[in-house]
Amino acid sequence: EVPSAMDLKECWALVNMSEKTRKHCMILENCCYDWFEMNTLNMAQQGVFGEVVRAQGAYIHNLEPFWDHYWKNGENDKLGWRLEYNMKHRGDVYATHGLGPVAQALDIHRGDRMKTLVAMDTKSVVGKSLVEERTGQPCENFRNGDHTTTLIRTENGKVIEIQHDVMTPQPYNRLYQLTGTKGFANKYPIEGYALDAKQLNASGVVPEVDNLNSHSFMPKKDMEALVQKYQHPILKKYGEMAKEVGGHGGMDFIMDSRLVYCLQNGLPLDMDVYDLAEWCCLAELGELSMDNNCAAVAFPDFTRGEWNKVKGYKHAYASPEDESVAMEKAKKITAKLKEKGAVEWAGEAVENKK
């Protein structure tokens, strides 16, 4: 799973290699394919919320039940790789679940770019105690704060807030909020949309009540009607099958399906190497900010000046005819691979009997 790089050197290495070899490099950020995020992205792209000016995302997940299950480097490793990494590194070291979906909604490097950030963290209380419990020794310095907040300002004057907290007993939360000039979307802790009656009518949905306003979330029936009208085309295609297959509720399956679909049809991938670098670089940039009294830190332009060339984030689709041709070709390749696999498996079975 994510992230793909943990510092600027690794981010630039992946960008440079992708450009040098002209090969795709996609970050497997499954949260971009969750139902609420995809439907809300479609609404934002259709102007339901007006202009989106602020967004929030997070990874808030108490890892207390999981610390002892991460890979350990031998019997003497009392911490495991993840707790040790948090001990040694400050900043948002797991930003992409929260940042990825909101970056798409704000057209990052497709008309806008993240320009500067300021990061702040709490002191480490839980982190230090976890180390001391496992090692039996005092922990003098646990770099990662119990809760980290990063504020980002974009070139076009938008603001993104990203939070990271794997220590405190908060319920699981990725936030995912979009604040627009005409509407609001919120996923955690309660899914809801806030639109006034005029804006809901403008979006093509007739409200169930006459006094609908944006001071609270809309009634359930109005929300269901809005979601039905703006159901994302990708969910229409893969949604039901994804629920059957599963994988984080099905979003893993949708992500994998889109990766295969784009490769089969020769299309740009949903997330490119520049997304990867922009989302992952938050870790080191936030660390730089906090280590310098929470100073503003500039984002590198991984696109080398091309961030405004593409206008608006979009998913790529093939024509029905091209889809059909690609699918038939894929079926033939799959059949050959299955046939080859069956022969090899039979040969291995014979060898094993000997």
What would you call each of these model-derived segments?
Residues E1, C25-E29, E161-Q163:
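Short catalytic-loop micro-motif centered on adjacent basic/acidic residues
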Residues L14, T40, L285:
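Aromatic/hydrophobic pocket-lining residues that form π-stacking "cages" and hydrophobic walls in ligand
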Residues T21-M26, C31-F142:
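Predominantly a Rossmann-like dinucleotide-binding segment in NAD(P)-dependent oxidoreductases
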Residues T96-H97, N141-D146, T154-E155, P169-Q170:
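A short catalytic or substrate-binding loop motif that flags glycine-/basic-rich loops and adjacent residues
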Residues A103, P171-T179, N186-P189, A194-K354:
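C-terminal helical cap and adjacent loop that interface with cofactors, partners, or active-site loops
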Residues T150-N156, G180:
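Active-site beta-strand termini and strand-to-loop segments that position acidic
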